[in-house]
């Protein structure tokens, strides 16, 4: 539409240009005719009044034609302007589309749950999954046990899983003989992998059995961690072997040897013995050693 308006504007501009050019040519022609008529009047014997009347009539007829042409061009221009005003934004107009209502299917799929989940259907009666209503399974049309077998017990009690699901897993407990529990980490890691595989193959267990098993494993893990920390990782020899503590021991030994006028080796043995006493398990209370270190202790007043 914009290109059509631009082309129509070019056509209108060309009309005005040609009309003005024709009018100028007509005026120039009239001037030439006037000069020619004056020249001919001076040399002809035609009556002057007749020539002038003819000239006036021709001039008036030319002006009338030009005025009519200009009025027609103005009228066509006003029509184009009114068309553009009535349709100000024609590019972005589009036919009105009918609103399409998205209707839901009347026969929506109903998600059925076992009768053991009846508390969900009771407490959350408006629960929907993917647009489908959640309802209890009818025991007549399915192979699940009757509702009376799920009368008591929590919702997620694993011992109440229906029998057909239990029969699908068949293993012999004798395949995994129980071994005495030992108290070191390597055996704990190995047995945990074996027990994990055995738990996956055995029958479903209840929450109580599962919680007891997890508590037992956590206690074993903490005991093993404490034993490793006390007897291996945090032993006095390993603590004293660290670079930071040994540097501090050397500084303390030098200070003690200077203050007490002792050899460096003896002062170091004293510091080691004191640290071993502090880190021994027999002492439950740490006392501050009575060491008076001062550089002015041997100075006489």
Curated annotation (Swiss-Prot):
Motif (pLxIS motif): 290-294
Swiss-Prot/TrEMBL induction comment: Escape from X chromosome inactivation results in an increased expression in females. In monocytes and B cells, induced by type I and type II interferons as well as LPS.
One GO term describing the cellular component: nucleoplasm
Keywords, in A-Z order: Cytoplasm, Endosome, Immunity, Innate immunity, Lysosome, Membrane, Nucleus, Phosphoprotein
The record's account of how the chain is modified after translation: The phosphorylated pLxIS motif constitutes an IRF5-binding motif, leading to recruitment of the transcription factor IRF5 to induce type-I interferons and other cytokines.
Tissue: Highly expressed in immune cell types such as B-cells, neutrophils, dendritic cells and monocytes, the expression levels are two-three-fold higher in female cells compared to male cells (at protein level). Expressed at low levels in T-cells and NK cells.
GO biological process: innate immune response; positive regulation of innate immune response; positive regulation of toll-like receptor 7 signaling pathway; positive regulation of toll-like receptor 8 signaling pathway; regulation of lysosomal lumen pH; regulation of toll-like receptor signaling pathway
Effect of residue 294 to A: Abolished ability to activate IRF5
Outcome recorded upon mutating residue 294 to D: Phosphomimetic mutant; retains ability to activate IRF5
Superkingdom of this protein's organism: Eukaryota
Function: Innate immune adapter that mediates the recruitment and activation of IRF5 downstream of endolysosomal toll-like receptors TLR7, TLR8 and TLR9. Following recruitment to endolysosome by SLC15A4 downstream of TLR7, TLR8 and TLR9, specifically recruits IRF5 transcription factor via its pLxIS motif, leading to IRF5 activation and subsequent expression of type I interferons. Plays a role in the regulation of endolysosomal pH in immune cells such as B-cells, dendritic cells and monocytes.
Name of this chain's protein: TLR adapter interacting with SLC15A4 on the lysosome
Organism, scientific name: Homo sapiens (Human)
Encoding gene (name): TASL
């Amino acid at each position: 539409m914009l290109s059509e308006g631009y082309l129509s504007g070019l056509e209108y501009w060309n009309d005005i240009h040609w009309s003005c050019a024709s009018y100028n040519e007509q005026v120039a022609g009239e001037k030439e005719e006037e000069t020619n008529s004056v020249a001919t009047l001076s040399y002809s014997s035609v009556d002057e009044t007749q020539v002038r009347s003819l000239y006036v009539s021709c001039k008036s007829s030319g002006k009338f034609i030009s005025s009519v042409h200009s009025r027609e061009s103005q009228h066509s221009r006003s029509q184009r302007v009114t068309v553009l005003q009535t349709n100000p934004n024609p590019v972005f107009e589009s036919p009105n589309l009918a609103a399409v209502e998205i209707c839901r299917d009347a026969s929506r799929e109903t998600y059925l749950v076992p009768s053991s989940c009846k508390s969900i259907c009771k407490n959350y009666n408006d629960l929907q999954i993917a647009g489908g209503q959640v309802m209890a399974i009818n025991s007549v049309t399915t192979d699940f046990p009757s509702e009376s077998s799920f009368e008591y017990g929590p919702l997620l009690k694993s011992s109440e899983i229906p029998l057909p699901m239990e029969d699908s897993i068949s293993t012999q407990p004798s395949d995994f003989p129980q071994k005495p529990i030992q108290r070191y980490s390597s055996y704990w890691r190995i047995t945990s992998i074996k027990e994990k595989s055995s738990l996956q193959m055995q029958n479903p267990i209840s929450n109580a059995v599962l919680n007891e098993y997890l508590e037992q494993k956590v206690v074993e893990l903490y005991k093993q961690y404490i034993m490793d920390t006390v007897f291996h990782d945090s032993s006095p020899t390993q603590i004293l072997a660290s670079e930071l503590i040994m540097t501090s021991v050397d500084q303390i030994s030098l200070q003690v040897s200077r203050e007490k006028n002792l050899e460096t080796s003896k002062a170091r043995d004293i510091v080691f013995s004191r640290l071993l006493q502090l880190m021994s398990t027999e002492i439950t209370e740490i006392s501050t050693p009575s060491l008076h270190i001062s550089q002015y202790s041997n100075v006489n007043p």
